[in-house]
Amino acid sequence: MAAAGVVSGKIIYEQEGVYIHSSCGKANDQDSLISGILRVLEKDAEVIVDWRPLDDALDSSSILCAGKDSSSVVEWTQAPKERAHRGSDQQSSYEAEWDMVTTVSFKKKPHTNGDAPGHRNGKSKWSFLFSLADLKSVKQSKEGMGWSYLVFCLKDDVMLPALHFHQGDSKLLIESLEKYVVLCESPQDSRTLLVNCQNKSLSQSFENLLDEPAYGLIQKIKKDPYTATMVGFSKVTNYIFDSLRGSDPSTHQRPPSEMADFLSDAIPGLKINQQEEPGFEVITRIDLGERPVVQRREPVSLEEWNKSLDPEGRLVAVESMKQKIFRGGLSHSLRKQAWKFLLGYFPWDSTKEERTQLQKQKTDEYFRMKLQWKSVSEAQEKRNSRLRDYRSLIEKDVNRTDRTNKFYEGQDNPGLILLHDILMTYCMYDFDLGYVQGMSDLLSPLLYVMENEVDAFWCFASYMDQMHQNFEEQMQGMKTQLIQLSTLLRLLDSGFCSYLESQDSGYLYFCFRWLLIRFKREFSFLDILRLWEVMWTELPCKNFHLLLCCAILESEKQQIMAKHYGFNEILKHINELSMKIDVEDILCKAEAISLQMAQCKELPQAVCEILGLQDSEITTPDSDTDENVGSPCPVSAFPSSTLPILAASEAKDDSPTQTLASPNACRLTPA
C-alpha cells in the first residue's frame, strides 16, 4: 500500500491491560478476553483514539490506518524517549488549543486484497480507531461492579465494543479526553457522559477565559503564538463557533490566520462591511470637535451624604448626588449604604422606615430560597444533575476567587462560606441561568462591601439583572456589546480600527473579558470598587463602560501601531494590561469622550442609540415658531450648567490629552 500523505503524531495517553470481552459462543458462558493497548494520539488539530490487540500493537513506533478512500496512510509515530506517561498531565502541548477538531469518519483498518483482518489474526477484527470529533458519548460502568469499563458511542450511532480496564485507570482516560472536549453527565443517565454539553461548555469556556494561569501557558498549534496569549478566549469563541457553525465539514479546519474572520462570519451581527449594501448606515466623515478636558472630584463623604437626607431619611436632589458620585465615587464608609441605592435594592425616594421594612421582607425571602437547596438530601441531589453541577462549579470557583484579599484568604474563611451560600441561593432565585463561571467575580466585591449575606445577595441579584445576557448560552449581550464597541471606536478613530482590521483584530475579541465581568480582572480590587460605583450611576450616558473600553484602547494605540503589533502581539499586549491601568485617568478620558460626542451635532443615529443620546427639538425661549422643530441635537445626560468641562487652554499638564476623530468612513452591519 502506498504510504502517501504520511504524517507523524504524538502519543499523549497510553494504557495496556485494556481488554475486550468477546463471547466465544452461545454454548459458552465464558468471555474470551482479548488484551489490547489503548492510545490517544494527537496530530495538529486532530485527536485519535486507538485500540488494538496487543499482538498488533507490539511495534508502537508505527501505527497505520487508512483514510476514507484508503488511498492515503496516516502514520502515527513516537520519537525515542518520548513515550508518554499514563494519564493526562504529562503533556502541556494540548492544554491550550482552539479545540477545533477535524471531523473524520470512523476509519476501519485497511484490508489487503480483499482479505478481512480475521483471515490474518482472529483478534485483529476487534481493532478500532476514531477521531475524537466523531465521539458522541461515553458510557461508564457502575461503581463497585468489578473491572471498570467504558463504551464509546459515535455520532453515527456506531457503538464500539466495551473496553475493560483490568488495571484500572479508566478515569485517567476521561481526564485526558476532557483536555480536548467537554464531557458532562446526561440528564437521562448519570453513567453516560455527553460530548459538548452546552450549559457546561459555556461555563468551562468562561472558566478558561477567566483563569489567570491559562493566560500564561505557552501552548501552540503549529507553533502559532496566538494560543499562548488568548487560550481562554479561544475556547469561548470556539464555543460560539461550535454552537452556530452547523455540520458543514468544510468549516471544520481553518488555518489560524483565517480564524478571526471565520468566527465573525459564524456570529451573526459581528460583521463590519465596507461595501455599500442596503440597510447599512454610513458613518461619514464627522468632525467631533475639540475634546473637553475634565477633572475628577473628591469622593462623596458620609457627612455629605447625610446632609442630603430629609428628616424621614429620604434622599433629596437625587440627580445631583448621582453626578457627585460619578465624578468622585464614594468614601468607603459610605459604600455599604449608597451601593444599595445605586444597584436598585433601595428605591431612591424611600424613607428610612420603608427601607427597614423592605430589608425584613427581603431577609425572609432570601432564607426561604436558601432553605430550598439546604434541605435537599444527598439522595435527592443524586437525581438532580443540574443542582449537582451548579454546586460543583461554585465550590470550585469560590476556592479561587480573590483569595489574596484578606476578606477571603485562608482556609475555612467565613467570607468563602458566605460567597458559596449566596451563589447557591442565586441558583434557586434564577434556576434557568443557575451558575456560570465569572459570577463569583461579580459577587465578591459586593459581599466585601456589604459584610452581610442578605444585603449582598439582593445587590448581586440586581447587578445580575444588568449582566444577565452576558452569561446566557446564546451570549447575545456579548455579541451586541462587541458590535457597539466597534461602532464607537470607528467613529473615534477609524484609522486605528483599520489598523486592527489589517491585523485580524477588528472584531475586538480581546475586549471580551473586559465586557464579560466589567473589568474585574483588569483593575485592582479597590479600583474596581471605584469603577463600578461610577458606572452604576448610569452617567453621563448609556453604555458608559464601552467608552471606558475606547479610552483604554486609545491609550494603547500609539504603542500598538508604533511597534507594528500583529494579531498575536495585540492580544498579548492587551492581556498584560491587567492591574496596570490607572482607573482615574481612564474615567477622565471616557467622560471626555462622552462629552465630545454629546456636543457633536452630526452624531450618527447608531451612535446616539448606543449612548442613549436622544434627538430633541431645538427651541428658543423667545420664539414660539416651529422653524427648528425636528432638528436633531444630541442631549448630554448632564445639565449644561453642571458639565465639568475645562477649556483645552486651561487644562493642566497632567489632564487627559485631546484627540480628534479620524475622517475615514465605514459601514456597520446592524445587529
UniProtKB/Swiss-Prot annotation:
GO terms classed as biological process: regulation of GTPase activity
Domain Rab-GAP TBC, chain residue ranges per copy: 329-539
Coiled-coil intervals: none
Domain of life assignment: Eukaryota
Xref: InterPro entries: Rab-GAP-TBC_dom, Rab-GAP_TBC_sf, SGSM1/2_RBD
Localization (cell): Cytoplasm
Record PTM Phosphothreonine, positions in chain: 669
Segments for region (Disordered): 650-671
Molecular-function GO term, any one: GTPase activator activity
One matching Pfam family: PH_RBD
Name of this protein: TBC1 domain family member 15
Organism: Mus musculus (Mouse)
Phylogenetic lineage: Eukaryota, Metazoa, Chordata, Craniata, Vertebrata
